Curated annotation (Swiss-Prot):
EC number of the protein: 2.1.1.195
Name by which UniProt lists this protein: Cobalt-precorrin-5B C(1)-methyltransferase
Catalytic reaction equation(s): Co-precorrin-5B + S-adenosyl-L-methionine = Co-precorrin-6A + S-adenosyl-L-homocysteine
Keyword annotations of the record: Cobalamin biosynthesis, Methyltransferase, S-adenosyl-L-methionine, Transferase
Upper classification of the organism: Archaea, Thermoproteota, Thermoprotei, Sulfolobales, Sulfolobaceae
Gene assigned in the entry: cbiD
Organism: Saccharolobus solfataricus (strain ATCC 35092 / DSM 1617 / JCM 11322 / P2)
Entry's Gene Ontology BP terms: anaerobic cobalamin biosynthetic process; methylation
MF terms in GO: cobalt-precorrin-5B C1-methyltransferase activity
Length: 349
């Protein structure tokens, strides 16, 4: 089978910030203006990323990198991420978010409430990139010149991030998973897996795939992005067993019958979580907090681990009943992970 078109991968805002930080440190210490830098990523790949501009002063150096989204429809494509570096008195690397970087105003997100929206994974990426240049103490300031304006066109405010964009990315790489042509890629990958396995694990994203790899052979796991329903339909015609493994936010959309989980196709995450929580018999006070939360992650902070398990079991059972309608002759399984990777529910396995 031939894929008719090759899709371009992109880089995350976190990878852009890491590249800008490394270029700024090279400028600061070596007085050198690099046109590209190579950075390490959490998945072991190294990325060579173009640097748009480097400005060097006696005590500070700044570099700019443009976010590149590949063939993903992304409003952040082309956005400039600017990092400035100066020496720190101790040997630590301090990372500060300023103009255009959002601030976290609600609990449950990857960054702590009150901090700037720079994920722990990105902070580690930046530190690793800088440590390839020096072991000296460095202060990095991240700015996104047009971040506050662009953020108004994103969902950041709805989840409790205000004043700018988030600096995110679990792998550093942005995969083109949201367009129609990506289905052909999924079909090809399923056919490859079929040659060696009679089952397949459908994982919407990087974290789901990572957690699933602790339970299954990584070679039988396929990342499908938003196209969950289409991928399950394709897989149900090829395998004896199809396992859907994901995190709560994505799978709560499937619970509501939204099988393409791209934001443009609808959103019922908190409504679904509230509904399942009612069915699970959670206390009224907890239900109120859940329904008023801005994100699933925040809502989870109001629930005990046992309550999460009870609610997610209801969600998994409903999802299982939905996907069984695709093919009655297939053994389907649904696994829902907590945000720390622990399995909250496992139905049909």
């Amino acid at each position: 089978m031939i894929i008719n078109s090759l899709k371009r991968f992109g880089i995350t805002t976190g990878a852009a910030a890491s590249a800008a930080a490394k270029a700024a440190v090279i400028g600061l210490l070596n007085k050198e203006k690099r046109s590209t830098v190579v950075i390490p990523t959490p998945i072991g790949l190294r990325l060579e990323i173009p640097v748009e501009k480097v400005e060097i002063d006696s005590e500070i150096s700044c570099a700019e990198v443009k976010k590149f989204s590949g063939d993903n429809p992304d409003i952040l494509d082309g956005l400039v991420i600017r990092c400035c570096a100066k020496l720190n008195e101790n040997n630590e690397i301090v990372i500060i978010g300023e103009r255009g970087v959002g601030k976290v105003t609600r609990s449950g997100l990857k960054a702590t409430m009150g901090e700037m929206a720079i994920s722990p994974t990105v902070r580690e990426m930046i530190i690793n990139a800088i440590r390839e240049v020096t072991d000296k103490g460095i202060q990095i300031t991240i700015e996104v010149p047009n971040g506050e304006t662009i953020a108004e066109k994103t969902l950041n405010k709805m989840v409790g991030i205000v004043g700018g964009i988030s600096i995110l990315g679990t792998t550093g790489i942005e995969t083109p998973v949201s367009d129609d042509d990506y289905l052909e890629h999924i079909r090809c990958e399923l056919n490859v897996i079929r040659q060696s396995y009679d089952y397949v694990v459908i994982a919407p994203g990087n974290s789901a795939a990572k957690y699933a790899a602790e339970l299954f052979d990584s070679n039988c796991i396929i990342k499908v992005g938003d196209r969950i329903g289409d991928s399950i339909k394709l897989a149900s015609n090829l395998f004896k067993k199809v396992i859907l493994a994901g995190l709560p936010a994505k799978l709560l959309k499937v619970y509501a019958g939204i099988f393409n989980t791209h934001y443009s196709q609808g959103d019922a995450r908190l409504e679904s979580l509230t509904h399942a929580s009612v069915l699970a018999g959670l206390p009224y006070g907890t239900l109120t907090k859940i329904s008023n939360a801005l994100s699933v992650e925040e809502a989870f902070t109001y629930m005990t681990k046992e309550q999460r398990r009870k609610v997610m079991n209801i969600v998994a059972e409903k999802i299982l009943s939905r996907i069984k309608s695709f093919n009655d002759n297939i053994n389907f399984c649904v696994i829902i992970f907590d945000y720390d990777g622990e399995s909250l529910s496992r139905v049909g396995c």
